[in-house]
């Protein structure tokens, strides 16, 4: 039974989609004014992994993730670069698609843009005005937060506490327009020279929160199964989405809210963000780090937990991935001399691993326990591959299971070239050196023995480890 932690109820709940066998899932996408950084990628990877697991369990997943292609940040960035807002959006949407493809994130079923849905946004805002939930003022349109009885339910904050915080962030201009400090913009009047659209309230553009309400309900329906994003979106963005959507449709907006933990960096574990200027873009890091390693590093931490980004943690991920790849290569190598022996014992054991993996992942997508099962499977694979007589059917069954489970983490397992290259040997020697330093002699011997099977002999000398090919 799959359970998911629902931010709205603050507890794990059995996952039951509205329509059996189909999951409608919306993930808040980026504001496309710059390259995505590692923190943005964490959200994309976390929920791509959720999607992959749902598909693994047999669900058809309608996965919608938007692009915010007009807002204050985009207007500012376009002016700084001397290009139009649409040109800026096109530049960074293309970059997003390239970067996410590099880290093996499946394209969404739909990637709608805010600017493609202006007509629907205006209609949605008009509906809220007619119902008394919104009011126009000098070209802007604001939402009456207090009119929505459940405002604050997602973030668990009282209206009084929210009012104190909101009062501190209301500009002088907004003081004269808003009926209440809690009210937020649905539509913003255009300033001179800004990109804008005609509306019943004059030229303007949509507010950020209304974009996601409109696009999620337009493409997935009035009630969606999963709405996901980073923890920083819980309030005000997702809180406001609930208020807007449920006021307009009169129906429950989202059945399960999922929020991923932050990526932290530095000795003080600061949240990685553009505002703190401590971010690293995916565009830059994949020039130095194997994209599969970055993906594996991100995908193997449970989505609600924070991730500490560091070179040491990346190195650990590299070593663990090498360990899995080496086991896969050993199996491939043994296919050459495998016989047609019995496979039943192996397939029975694989069923146990498969069930163990599902049990782990069914617990709120617990990838850390899931990958622990993969490591157990790898250990079993290595022991089997070292036997004198192996079955071809068994070898292929183990490989198939490894490929299937690793694909859920977004990692492609493929056989390396039969002739192991020098770079790979050096990586394994370095991994062996670390294992010996940590007194992990079992892993050290495993690397040495696996290389020997591939015709590589290691020699430990006072000057370091050398190797030769038989």
Swiss-Prot record:
Name under which the protein is recorded: Cysteine--tRNA ligase
Record-listed E.C. numbers: 6.1.1.16
Motif ('KMSKS' region): 271-275
Keyword entries, A-Z: Aminoacyl-tRNA synthetase, ATP-binding, Cytoplasm, Ligase, Metal-binding, Nucleotide-binding, Protein biosynthesis, Zinc
Presence of the UniProt keyword Cell membrane in the record: no
Keyword Amino-acid biosynthesis: no
Residues spanning the signal sequence: none
Family assignment from sequence similarity: Belongs to the class-I aminoacyl-tRNA synthetase family.
Binding site for ATP: 274
GO molecular function, one term: zinc ion binding
Cofactor note: Binds 1 zinc ion per subunit.
Residues noted as binding Zn(2+) in the record, renumbered to the chain: 28, 212, 237, 241
Motif 'HIGH' region in this chain: 30-40
Entry-linked SUPFAM superfamilies: Anticodon-binding domain of a subclass of class I aminoacyl-tRNA synthetases, Nucleotidylyl transferase
PANTHER family in the record: CYSTEINE--TRNA LIGASE, CYTOPLASMIC, CYSTEINYL-TRNA SYNTHETASE
EC top class, as a word: ligase
């Amino acid at each position: 039974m799959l359970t998911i932690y629902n931010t709205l109820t603050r507890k794990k709940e059995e996952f039951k989609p509205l329509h059996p066998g189909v999951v409608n899932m919306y993930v808040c996408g980026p504001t496309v004014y710059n390259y995505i950084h590692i923190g943005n990628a964490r959200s994309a990877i976390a929920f791509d992994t959720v999607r992959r697991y749902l598909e693994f369990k047999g669900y058809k997943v309608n996965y919608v993730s938007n692009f915010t292609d007009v807002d204050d940040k985009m207007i500012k960035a376009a002016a700084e670069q001397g290009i139009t807002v649409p040109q800026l959006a096109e530049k960074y949407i293309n970059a997003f698609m390239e970067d996410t493809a590099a880290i093996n994130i499946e394209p969404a079923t739909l990637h709608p843009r805010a600017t493609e849905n202006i007509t629907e946004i205006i209609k949605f805002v008009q509906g809220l005005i007619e119902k008394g939930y919104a009011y126009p003022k000098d070209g802007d349109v604001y939402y009456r937060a207090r009119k929505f009885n459940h405002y604050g339910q997602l973030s668990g904050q009282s209206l009084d506490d929210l009012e104190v915080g909101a009062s501190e962030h209301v500009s002088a201009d907004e003081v004269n327009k808003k009926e209440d400090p809690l009210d937020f913009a649905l539509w913003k009047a255009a300033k001179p020279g800004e990109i804008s659209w005609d509306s019943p309230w004059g030229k303007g553009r949509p507010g950020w929160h209304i974009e996601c309400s409109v696009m999620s309900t337009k493409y997935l329906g009035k009630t969606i199964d999963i709405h996901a994003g980073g923890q920083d979106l819980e309030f005000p963005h997702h809180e406001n989405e609930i208020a807007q959507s449920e006021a307009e449709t009169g129906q429950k907006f989202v059945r399960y809210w999922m929020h991923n933990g932050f990526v932290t960096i530095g000795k003080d574990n600061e949240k990685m963000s553009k505002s703190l200027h401590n971010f690293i873009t995916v565009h830059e890091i994949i020039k130095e780090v194997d994209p599969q390693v970055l993906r594996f590093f991100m995908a193997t931490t449970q989505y609600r937990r924070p991730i500490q980004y560091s070179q040491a943690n990346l190195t650990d991920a590299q070593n663990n991935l090498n360990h899995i790849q080496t086991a896969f290569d050993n199996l491939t190598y043994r296919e050459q001399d495998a016989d047609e022996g019995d496979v039943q014992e192996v397939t029975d054991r694989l069923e146990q691993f498969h069930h163990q993996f599902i049990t782990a992942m069914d617990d709120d997508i617990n990838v850390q326990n899931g990958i622990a099962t993969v490591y157990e499977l790898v250990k079993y694979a290595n022991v089997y591959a070292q036997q004198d007589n192996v079955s071809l059917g068994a070898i292929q069954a183990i490989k198939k299971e490894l490929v299937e489970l690793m694909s859920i983490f977004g990692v492609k397992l493929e056989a390396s070239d039969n002739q192991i290259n020098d770079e790979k040997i050096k990586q394994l020697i370095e991994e062996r050196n670390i294992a010996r330093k940590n007194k992990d002699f079992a892993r050290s011997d495993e690397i040495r023995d696996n290389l020997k099977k591939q015709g590589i002999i290691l020699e430990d000398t006072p000057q370091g480890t050398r190797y030769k090919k038989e």
